[in-house]
Design a protein with these regions (language model features):
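A short, structured beta-strand-centered segment in the mid-to-C-terminal lobe
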Residues: 67-85
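Structured surface interface patches that mediate subunit assembly and partner/cofactor docking
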Residues: 1-3, 20-21, 25-31, 54-64, ...
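Short, structural beta-strand-to-alpha-helix junction motif
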Residues: 34-35, 74, 173
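Conserved alpha-helical segments that form or flank metal/cofactor-binding pockets of metalloenzymes
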Residues: 36-63
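N-terminal "assembly arms/tails" that initiate or stabilize quaternary assembly
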Residues: 2-40, 44
Length: 215
């Protein structure tokens, strides 16, 4: 799946899922956020991408502005904005391809946050692999807390941290790999997975970028 198709697919699913829900529903995997605030973020990302406001992309202040700018709007107004801007972002995805894959990663991650908030599992398709390809590259370049190699295999994607032996490895379903790599699982849950090797020295690797596993 290409980035444009992935973004269009995930956006469509999120808009469908958000239709008719209680805007004030908490999002457990995004502490302090409601569904409206989650949708304000993804809608705000679309607007910022189109306006070239990406110098601070992914930072807390950047996200906070997106949410605050839509605080006085209804959920329908927020999603209505995304309905209007989404097709323009699709065109940008066609032009930039994998150069905008971080957008897919963010949107896929938040689809799962939304699904968790309303108890509607799903969304496990090729868009997740587009997201994982970007995540694997970003994760690989982050700080290595110990010697050896940490390897997560998920579908056609391999996320590798470090170099050499010993190798600590695991095979996960793509959505499970996304959850583990985006702070949606606690360190105790990560450690309890069926690792081949001792993952404990690698646990700091699961705190990276904006992602902090819950207590």
């Amino acid at each position: 799946m290409e980035t444009a198709e992935a973004y269009q697919t995930v956006r469509g699913r999120m808009l469908d899922l958000a239709s008719g829900v209680d805007a004030a529903t908490p999002v457990p995997t995004c502490p302090g956020w409601t569904i409206k605030e989650l949708l304000s973020h993804v809608t705000g990302v679309a607007a910022d991408v189109l306006n070239g406001n990406i110098a601070e992309a992914g930072t807390d202040p950047w996200v906070a502005v997106q949410v605050a700018a839509r605080a006085d709007r209804s959920l329908d107004e927020v999603t209505g904005e995304w309905v209007e801007t989404g097709p323009q972002v699709d065109e940008l995805c066609v032009a930039l391809g994998d150069g905008i894959a971080q957008l897919i990663f963010d949107t896929v991650t938040h689809e799962q946050d939304l699904r968790g908030a309303i108890g509607q599992p799903g969304g496990d398709d090729a868009a997740v692999e587009v997201a994982l390809r970007w995540a694997a590259g970003a994760w690989a370049g982050s700080e290595v807390p110990t010697s050896g190699t940490l390897l997560i295999r998920a579908g056609s994607v391999e996320a590798v941290r470090g170099d050499g032996g010993p190798v600590v490895a695991i095979d996960l379903e793509p959505l499970d790999a996304m959850a583990v790599m985006t702070g949606r699982r606690s360190l105790s849950e990560v450690q309890a997975l069926a690792w081949d090797g001792d993952v404990e020295p690698w646990l700091p690797a699961f705190t990276w970028g904006p992602f902090v596993p819950p207590a």
